[in-house]
Curated annotation (Swiss-Prot):
Effect of C69G: Loss of farnesylation
One Pfam family it belongs to: G-gamma
Protein's gene: Ggamma30A
Taxonomic classification: Eukaryota, Metazoa, Ecdysozoa, Arthropoda, Hexapoda
Location(s), subcellular: Cell membrane; Cytoplasm; Cell projection, Axon; Cell projection, Rhabdomere
Protein name: Guanine nucleotide-binding protein subunit gamma-e
Bilayer disposition of the protein: Lipid-anchor
């Protein structure tokens, strides 16, 4: 961080930034290959229940239109 920026920050902002940096440093790091494998397995496990991939039954949808639009 730029030293001139530190002079302009107040004490509370510096404490908050230090807490944030400590939190980020304490996070467990994973290699990208492991992250991708975990994400892929999560997606494959939950794919069956995803309403965007498998549309729900239209008969049980209360918001689905019951009929066609009628022009008066």
């Amino acid at each position: 961080m730029d030293p001139s920026a530190l002079q302009n920050m107040d004490r509370d902002a510096l404490k908050k930034q230090i807490e944030n940096m400590k939190y980020q440093a304490s996070m467990e790091r994973w290699p990208l290959s492991k992250s991708i494998a975990e994400m892929r397995s999560f997606i494959e496990e939950n794919e069956k229940n995803d309403p965007l991939i498998n549309a729900p039954d239209k008969k049980n949808n209360p918001w689905a239109e019951k009929g066609k639009c009628v022009i008066m």
